[in-house]
């Protein structure tokens, strides 16, 4: 683990616009491709009489492995820039991407949007930008990729830029904050250093732009919220819940409550990386032990918080959702599974209160009969089993969710208000 500040980075954009290649290139340029992978390629290259290690080999190999059905997990690859230590959180195309992006399994701080110069804005470009906006990603760096295919044409680059700008304004992203960079992930132009092929461009390289991102501000003033991932029994210690602190801090001596299981007690010890610590804060993965709590008292999906400000348990909640893919239409009474932080609970959409214009967020229709793919709406939701969830304007880390059904992510959303049980 690096002592530089940490950034979670999402790489988003339409399929085949070059996201994997860009990830490969970023890892390659920052010396983060695992040594054994490089060695393997170097040997292959030498055997084939092509001395010298080429980036293309890494990518060819990734492509072959993908064809063999071995997905190269571009998620959770790590690289350093001068000022930051980056983790690439799930990239689209990864089957759980949308779910993970939403449920905070990988809350991204910032995102790189990859748009192919020869294709421009495509359907998933829209979906991912809208998602990024819904989930509170503020800084967007746009890599206009495959510039080599369009002969590094400034005119094409400007056309794509205009098109993306229009999209950002539609979803109310602050377009002035967006940084555009003409790149070729395959050839390496403007990824690590400025390219002579785009002499008309005087902006930073992609790595420079990443290095110039503002530092994420972890919310320490919010109360402790620690979603439980697993519960272990460790001999000599007892029951040890494990999870990531999303907000606030936890220390030995704290009086805590687990919701919705509705049990509590005093924290005895807090451990990180097998060492006892006096305090853990946002982003820390911890195991801790609470006096009087047994293995059967709590479970994955519970949220731990201070007894004086216990996590909220919803009888019903109002949420703003965007429907990404549904084979037909969604009507009141539909009961898919909601994934929020570490919890997975079947929830019924009791009513569809308003249909929104996805571009402006304005109300387009009151009490619509149904919503379908591409629609945004405000809905009232009733969990079928107790669920701890928070309004996203108060604790955003516990205020967003993914809706899954039939093995796919149907919708994403954020909690507007909670009617407590």
From Swiss-Prot:
Binding site for Mg(2+): 20
Region (G4): 145-148
A Pfam family matched in the record: GTP_EFTU
A GO CC term attached to the entry: cytoplasm
Keyword Transport on entry: no
Catalytic activities: GTP + H2O = GDP + phosphate + H(+)
Enzyme kind, highest EC tier: hydrolase
Annotated region described as G3, given as residue ranges: 90-93
UniProt xrefs under InterPro entries: EFTu-like_2 (IPR004161), G_TR_CS (IPR031157), GTP-eEF1A_C (IPR054696), P-loop_NTPase (IPR027417), Small_GTP-bd (IPR005225), T_Tr_GTP-bd_dom (IPR000795), TRAFAC_GTPase_members (IPR050100), Transl_B-barrel_sf (IPR009000)
Gene Ontology molecular function terms on file: GTP binding; GTPase activity; translation elongation factor activity
Region feature (G1): 13-20
Classification via NCBIfam families: EF-1_alpha, PRK12317.1, small_GTP
Membership in a protein family: Belongs to the TRAFAC class translation factor GTPase superfamily. Classic translation factor GTPase family. EF-Tu/EF-1A subfamily.
Name listed for the protein in its UniProt record: Elongation factor 1-alpha
Protein source organism: Haloquadratum walsbyi (strain DSM 16790 / HBSQ001)
Name of the coding gene: tuf
